[in-house]
Amino acid sequence: MDMVDRTSRRGYRDWFVQRITALLSGIYAVFVIVFLLVHHPISYPQWHALFSHLIMKIFTLIVIFSILWHAWIGMWTIFTDYVKNKPIRLALETLVCLLLVGYFVWAIEFLWIAR
């Protein structure tokens, strides 16, 4: 019985995290859409100025991290539900994890290092 409780808590946590990450993504999308509508037609200097602010870089990085976390929970759930062969599931999970980490590193490079 104890095992069922731990599983249900993890399921609830995953459900909750997906709702929070979706909310963050939605807030970010609304902000960007409003910015685009207010500054129509937008120029490159305006776009660059928006993403040059420290707060926007931090917010963008948080949203990217939350999207990747959201994706990880979704892919983990799909693999757990549909891939019954454990070595194949582990290989797929490892591949997805490496890709998501790579995407996050790429986002950091794009936001903070690239000029």
From Swiss-Prot:
Periplasmic compartment segments: 36-57
Q: Quaternary structure per UniProt?
A: Part of an enzyme complex containing four subunits: a flavoprotein, an iron-sulfur protein, plus two membrane-anchoring proteins, SdhC and SdhD.
**Lineage: superkingdom:** Bacteria
A single Gene Ontology CC term: plasma membrane
- Hydrolase as UniProt keyword: no
Q: What does this protein do?
A: Membrane-anchoring subunit of succinate dehydrogenase (SDH).
| Name of this chain's protein | Succinate dehydrogenase hydrophobic membrane anchor subunit
Compartmental location: Cell inner membrane
**What residue ranges are annotated as transmembrane?**
15-35, 58-79, 90-113
Q: Which pathway does this chain act in?
A: Carbohydrate metabolism; tricarboxylic acid cycle
For the ligand (heme), the binding residues are H70
Gene source species: Coxiella burnetii (strain RSA 493 / Nine Mile phase I)
Kindly give the membrane topology term recorded for this protein. Answer: Multi-pass membrane protein
Primary localization class, coarse:
membrane
Q: Which GO terms describe its molecular function?
A: electron transfer activity; heme binding; metal ion binding
**Matching NCBIfam families:** succ_dehyd_anc (TIGR02968)
What is the gene called?
Answer: sdhD
- GO BP terms: aerobic respiration; cytochrome complex assembly; tricarboxylic acid cycle
